[in-house]
Design a protein with these regions (language model features):
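Generic preference for hydrophobic/aromatic residues in regular secondary structure cores
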Residues: 18, 38, 119, 176-183
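A generic structural signal for short hydrophobic patches within well-formed alpha-helices
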Residues: 115-116, 207
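Sequence-level detector for tyrosine residue identity
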Residues: 4, 23, 84, 146, ...
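Acidic, divalent-metal-coordinating active-site segment for phosphoryl/phosphodiester hydrolysis
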Residues: 149-161
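Acidic two-metal-ion nuclease catalytic site recognized across multiple nuclease folds
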Residues: 160-236
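Conserved non-catalytic scaffold segment of RNase H-like nuclease domains
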Residues: 1-109, 114, 121-148
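Charge-rich, low-complexity amphipathic helices
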Residues: 78-81, 119, 137-138, 153-154, ...
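Hydrophobic/aromatic-lined pockets within catalytic cores
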Residues: 120, 124, 136, 159-169
Length: 236
């Protein structure tokens, strides 16, 4: 089974359909160094069968006539051997792939955005471009203008991920996945009237209300329930 860094560009943010998808294989060497597998690379534009929003056109530089004669986004298929899928805000990419009828039920997701927020909370931005400026300023200076092109974004993601793994002694994919799963559980509320408040300090009635919301992020749900269980244990 293999691991891939993937990036998608989409027609918009609501029910996103792919306009461009790129991926490349990655593997840890026996010495624990993250390396690219350039022979396992893919890049293609797709017709999203939806009008590309002005916002997406401005960000990606992909216009309706650029993809009018491209294959439909539903033609895309993940490699059959894919076990781990890595991306910056990977859940957005997963939504794009799901809308392209890809089955992700057995795929383990690794999120570099969550890892960066967890390991480097002091940074003023955790966007992919900002992280590239932080870890690889010389590369960023020459190439940041190509951000939001899927081919370049998977390269940027690799450089950011390689730096994170090196600094935190992550040497295999299973260890990286566990680090990502831990990082994806928030410790601070990122929205709502209690934005910025530590999960452990949230009012119990607000936690109860949140847990009843059908569209609650599963990692926030996990953080809330684990904290509630811990608080209950402390009272016993």
């Amino acid at each position: 089974m293999s691991s891939y860094i993937l990036d998608t560009e989409a027609h918009g943010l609501v029910e996103p359909h792919a306009t461009e998808i790129a991926y490349i294989g990655v593997v840890f060497s026996p010495a624990g160094e993250l390396i690219l597998q350039t022979h396992n690379a893919f890049e293609q534009r797709f017709n999203p069968h939806k009008k590309i929003t002005l916002g997406s056109q401005a960000i990606t530089g992909i216009f309706d006539d650029d993809v009018a004669d491209k294959p439909p986004h539903t033609d895309f298929e993940l490699p059959k051997d894919c076990e781990y899928l890595i991306g910056h805000n990977i859940d957005f990419d997963a939504d794009v792939l799901t809308n392209a009828d890809c089955d992700l039920s057995s795929i383990k997701r690794i999120c570099t955005l969550a890892l960066a927020r967890h390991f480097f909370p002091q940074l003023d931005s955790h966007s992919l471009g900002a992280l590239l400026c932080f870890f690889e300023p010389q590369v960023a200076k020459k190439n940041i203008k190509f951000a939001h092109g899927a081919k370049y974004d998977i390269w940027f993601t690799f450089l950011v991920l390689k730096a994170i793994c090196y600094q935190h002694r992550i040497t295999d994919m299973a260890q990286l996945y566990q680090a990502s799963e831990h990082a994806r559980k928030p410790t601070v509320m990122r929205f709502g009237k209690h934005k910025g408040v530590a999960i452990k300090d949230l009012p119990p009635d607000y936690v109860d209300w949140l847990l009843k919301q059908a569209d609650l992020d599963p990692y926030l749900h996990l953080a809330l329930t684990e904290n509630s269980a811990g608080n209950h244990g402390n009272l016993l």
